[in-house]
Amino acid sequence: MDDNKRPLYLPFAGPAILEAPLINKGSAFSEEERIFFNLEGLVPYAIETIEEQASRAYDQFRSFNNDLDKHIYLRNIQDTNETLFYRLVQNHISEMMPIIYTPTVGLACERFSKNYRRNRGLFISYPNKDRIDDILNNSTRQKVKIIVVTDGERILGLGDQGIGGMGIPIGKLSLYTSCGGISPAYTLPITLDVGTDNPQLLEDPMYMGWRHPRIGGEEYAEFIEAFMQAVHVRWPDTLIQFEDFAQKNAMPILERYKERYCCFNDDIQGTAAVTVGSLLAACKAAGTELNKQRVAFLGAGSAGCGIAEAIVAQMVSEGISDEQARSQVCMVDRWGLLLDNMPNLLPFQQKLAQKCADISHWNNFSDNISLLDVVNNAKPTVLIGVSGAPGLFTEEIVRAMHSHCPRPIIFPLSNPTSRVEATPKDILHWTSGQALVATGSPFEPVVVDGETYEIAQCNNSFIFPGIGLGVLASGARHVSDAMLMASSRALAECSPLAINGSGPLLPKLEDIHSVSKHIAFAVGKVAIEQGLSLPASDELLMQSIEDNFWKPEYRRYKRTSF
């Protein structure tokens, strides 16, 4: 029987119900519920449906003149009536996703302490490192199945935001629910407050975090270890998603814990999965295969290298050697093309550095090989930007790429929109509409020579909700590389352009529920095949996905004392 059709028995009544966002219905309480729960007079007389409430809330939403005010308004609804919040977002997903998450969430993080209104999630501060167990027990969420955790050091492209980074776990979990059907009762945002190196925050009298320079080294590692152990004791089956950790910490943390606990890093693995899925769709639309592409990256941090490694793995799965695949991927950072003779390369960069001997014949060979040099010599067919620096995909670079590639695949993925390497409008005009474009943030359609091009948003929200749903539905104990690869292939199978030869590269957000279920099935099936969860037939897995898919509908309430 559907949970929404079963009554929910509650042991308390009166104002306490109205103050509990997971169960509050506001004006939608029935006459019987108002009597039994002592709510008469506490809400207006009229009994409304959730759609009537959502209609009013949408009118109020549209009355605000800027996106930050809209974000604050939606967060207020979320903190008072979560079911209504998710019905409202579900009804207007394309309009509201940029408000509850990127790009607006970046501004919300910057102003977190100034705009703080009500508690949500947990703040675990370093001075309380010996009381992490107690803090976890203080959570009002008792059946946590998904945690998104950040330390606030690398928030989007905005850098160190301290505890203001809490806006990211809150926003990400909102998407787990609105896109992936994860019940909000099973989600918990957490910020690890380890100080901040942002002088503006340290000097801001309104900053609400621990006023101390960031800890590092052994102190930091021991704090993360204590946190991970405590979470595993409190909720042993929960999925932990790492979010917006700095480059120096993100990869080491992932490598340390991915085999011990059920966890993944969305910036590294989620971004890689959605990018590979988008590339597979673009290749199919262009009538080619990924293993035939030459790929150039601008940005060689943990996210860029994570994407590159996923591309290499997919190329290898398509039949070429690892060595050949790596020779087809060029990583460019602020110092130029990564080369194997460069000192101070990070461990995750070393395997992606080009061999000097292999490029010695290039024109303009020097110690600092620019992106334009790479385009002119390597002749890439794919260009991916994860630099966080705006405008670096110049007209000269894009035109040079198009001169040797009739249908270049160009993904300027940096967030927010103010930091994108090039706008879709410019890219499509420079390539006469021939480029296959996907971006990290939302952009309006572009018209070139009378033809309208819808811009695909290579957004992690197409991937991580489905991964989370697949993990929950299958009971997977870990998130394996094969599960992530399966999510990429499943996303590509949903591409309108690849399937129909027209339309956007990625599905519309209005189709996100079916996309997430499709990805969840692919992820869960691999988990079962790898022995990471209990055996189950395809039918049982699909039924589990449906059973775990929460819908924003009010349940009937009964009082336990009656």
Swiss-Prot record:
InterPro entries in the cross-refs: Aminoacid_DH-like_N_sf, Malic_enzyme_CS, Malic_N_dom, Malic_N_dom_sf, Malic_NAD-bd, Malic_OxRdtase, NAD(P)-bd_dom_sf, NAD_malic_enz_proteobac
Cysteine disulfide links: none
UniProt keyword annotation of Hydrolase present: no
Enzyme class of the recorded protein, top EC level: oxidoreductase
Positions bound to a divalent metal cation: 243-244, 267
Catalytic activities: (S)-malate + NAD(+) = pyruvate + CO2 + NADH; oxaloacetate + H(+) = pyruvate + CO2
Molecular function terms, GO-annotated: malate dehydrogenase (decarboxylating) (NAD+) activity; malic enzyme activity; metal ion binding; NAD binding; oxaloacetate decarboxylase activity
Subunit comment: Homotetramer.
Protein name as it appears in the record: NAD-dependent malic enzyme
Organism of derivation: Shewanella oneidensis (strain ATCC 700550 / JCM 31522 / CIP 106686 / LMG 19005 / NCIMB 14063 / MR-1)
